[in-house]
Every structure is written in structure tokens, then in C-alpha cells.
Amino acid sequence: MVIYAQKDISNDFIKEIIKTGEILGEGHVSSFKACYQCGTCTGSCPSGRITAFRTRKLIRYAQFGMKSAIIDSEDLWMCTTCYECYERCPRTVKITDIIKVLRNIAAREGKMAEAHKKTALYVFKTGHAVPINDQIKKARKEIGLTEIPPTTHKYPDALEVVRGIMKDLRFCDMVGICTETMQLKPVEWKDMSE
């Protein structure tokens, strides 16, 4: 069991969460303040059924402004963004979007799960998070779709646009993507608990 002290609680972090989430609309991300810890989110979470992930714990830490408890936690990266919690919350807390905002904050601090870095690298390389292979093409054709989706697979010139956006937003720097070698740079995690 981890015990947190008063020094771990920060109103500045609460403000940072709200400021980072402003792009989603006024009051959207600050909806985490309305959570009364009923547990509906945790009970409906598919990740929580097979891991120790507890959605409401992240929201509680956000309410208390416990930055290191959130960004140093693997739990932050266990959410599949399925929106079950979001849809079922009786207080209309925008949980999934809040988790995305918390991930953005963690990534800016150099705290991103390795699997998410690899996915980001794949997006940089191909324009997609999920590869298109012969099995996917066959399945698409069987259900009446074109074998190749109308994305960067079909329009390869658009891939340079995607890469340009990622570079302009400094996403590659944040994730640690070497744009010349198309590999992840080795990055040391900063220990925020000290």
C-alpha cells in the first residue's frame, strides 16, 4: 500500500488538468470534480476485469491533485478508451477524455508507456495505429468494404501530411521518435517521486 503525504497534493495540478483539457470545451474535463466515487466506472471497465486497473482511483487522485500518483502509474495506460465508463457515469463525468488529458500531461513529463510509444511510432511510419495485412484486407472484402481503407494506405501522399503534423506539434520529440531512422530513441524516465 502506498501512502501519500500532504506534499503530494497540489491545486496547481488540478488547474493543469483543466487547462490541458480546455481544447475539449469549457467544463468538459473539469467534470471530474463531480465524481462521488460510486464505482460505476470501475465496475463497467473491461480492463479492470483482468487487471488491477481502477478507473475511479485515477479520478480520485485527480480530484486531490496527486500528480505523481497519476503520471508515475502504469494504470494510466491500461484504459482502452472504450468509453464504457463515460457512457455509464451517473454524474456525466467525461472519464475517458480526462484519462486522455492525464496521458497528455504524463507524456509531456516523459512518462509514456512503451507500448504506446511503439504505437505512436507505427502511426508515424504508416499513418495508422493498426497494421493492414492480408487477413484484414480479406475481412474487409467479405463484409463489402474495399480491401484498402480510404486512408494513408490508399492515399500515400497523405502520410507526409500526417508526419508533418506530428513534427509540427513536437509529438515526435515528446514520444522520442527519431524521424531520420524511424526508430524510438532510448529515453530515461524521470523519477517524479523524488
Swiss-Prot record:
Protein known as? CoB--CoM heterodisulfide reductase iron-sulfur subunit C 1
Q: Which UniProt keywords apply?
A: 4Fe-4S, Iron, Iron-sulfur, Metal-binding, Methanogenesis, Oxidoreductase, Repeat
Can you tell me where the transmembrane regions are?
A: none
Could you tell me which Gene3D superfamilies the record lists for this protein?
Alpha-helical ferredoxin
Residue sites binding [4Fe-4S] cluster 1 per the record: 35, 38, 41, 89
Annotated InterPro entries: 4Fe4S_Fe-S-bd, 4Fe4S_Fe_S_CS, CoB/CoM_hetero-S_Rdtase_csu, HdrC_iron-sulfur_subunit, Helical_ferredxn
Lineage, uppermost ranks: Archaea, Methanobacteriati, Methanobacteriota, Methanomada group, Methanococci
Q: Which cofactor does it need?
A: [4Fe-4S] cluster
Q: Which Pfam families match?
A: Fer4_9
Family note: Belongs to the HdrC family.
Q: Where is the 4Fe-4S ferredoxin-type domain?
A: 25-55, 67-98
Give the disulfide map: none
| Assembly and binders | The heterodisulfide reductase is composed of three subunits; HdrA, HdrB and HdrC.
Q: Where does [4Fe-4S] cluster 2 bind?
A: 45, 79, 82, 85
Pathway membership: Cofactor metabolism; coenzyme M-coenzyme B heterodisulfide reduction; coenzyme B and coenzyme M from coenzyme M-coenzyme B heterodisulfide: step 1/1
Per the UniProt entry, what are the Gene Ontology biological process annotations, in alphabetical order? Answer: anaerobic respiration; electron transport chain; methanogenesis
